[in-house]
Regions:
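Feature marks flexible
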Residues: 1-24, 64-226
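A cross-kingdom feature that marks long, compositionally biased intrinsically disordered regions
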Residues: 25-29, 38
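Outer-membrane beta-barrel channels and translocator barrels
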Residues: 30, 43-44
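Membrane-spanning beta-strands of outer-membrane beta-barrel proteins
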Residues: 30-32, 223
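Residues on the lipid-exposed face of transmembrane beta-strands in outer-membrane beta-barrel proteins
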Residues: 35-41, 226-230
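Transmembrane beta-strands of outer-membrane beta-barrel pores
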Residues: 43, 54-58
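Transmembrane beta-strands of outer-membrane beta-barrel proteins
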Residues: 46-52
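Intrinsically disordered, low-complexity acidic/polar segments
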Residues: 48, 59-61
């Protein structure tokens, strides 16, 4: 069995196996603005020609690695509860003898990712709870997903609208230099930018939750040329 985002190995490293994943998604747009001017005049025995050309391209692109998002979700969802709360053990005893010592998961809000908060909220779970969510159990037929409560009992919850890339922040989608999304001229969700951001905006612009939006402007090279001919 393969986990979500995993793909079967190629035959002898040469041929793709049946079931190989092809999930990258990309789109782009390009337009061009151009102005050309030319004139000529006679000055005595000279015919002088003057010309000028201005051209600006505007290229934008957006891409997402769909299969890798499963890997990212798996890493982010329970990252903040991957340690045990050893300071608060629960002792189970029978007839005066200690039978079992239980350590529940420890919640660490400082290490909780925005995706983890958004997913728990969408599932109707406490954002500060220690429920262990199994993202690989997601059922496309009814949008159900399995999770284990603090006592290790399995339950099901439902994502009414399924997973959405807006659950992530831009930094989560580009962390450690990994290109889960790539974009310029669009925002990290794939929406066309309404204005050209500045270089500083990439480092300073934040949303209402204090997350950096990381806008990247479209590629807009300018070409200019002029000539004078006698």
């Amino acid at each position: 069995a393969l986990l979500n985002s995993s793909s079967p190995s190629a035959f002898y490293g040469m041929y793709a196996a049946p079931g190989s994943i092809q999930s990258n998604y990309n789109y782009s747009e390009a337009d061009q603005f151009s102005v050309k001017l030319a004139t000529a005049m006679t000055l005595g025995n000279h015919e002088v020609k003057i010309g000028f050309e201005y051209e600006q391209r505007n290229n934008r692109s957006y891409g997402v690695a769909g299969d890798d998002l499963w890997y990212l979700m798996r890493n982010l969802t329970n990252f903040h509860i991957d340690q045990l709360d050893t300071e608060n053990p629960e002792i189970v005893s029978h007839d005066g003898f200690v039978d079992t010592i239980i350590y529940k998961r420890k919640y660490n809000g400082d290490s909780q990712y925005q995706f983890a908060q958004n997913l728990r909220k969408a599932l109707g779970l406490s954002e500060t709870g220690i429920d262990w969510i199994n993202t690989d159990s997601y059922d496309f037929n009814d949008n159900s997903i399995e999770y284990y409560d603090e006592n290790g009992i399995m339950h099901k919850a439902y994502l009414q609208d399924g997973f959405d890339i807006s659950m992530f922040t831009p930094d989560e989608l580009t962390q450690d230099g990994n290109s889960y999304v790539s974009y310029y001229g669009y925002d990290y969700l794939g929406n066309k930018l309404k204005k050209q951001p500045s270089f500083e905006d990439f480092f300073t612009e934040q949303d209402e939750n204090g997350n950096y939006t990381r806008p990247v402007g479209s590629f807009r090279p300018i070409y200019m040329a002029g000539y004078i001919q006698d």
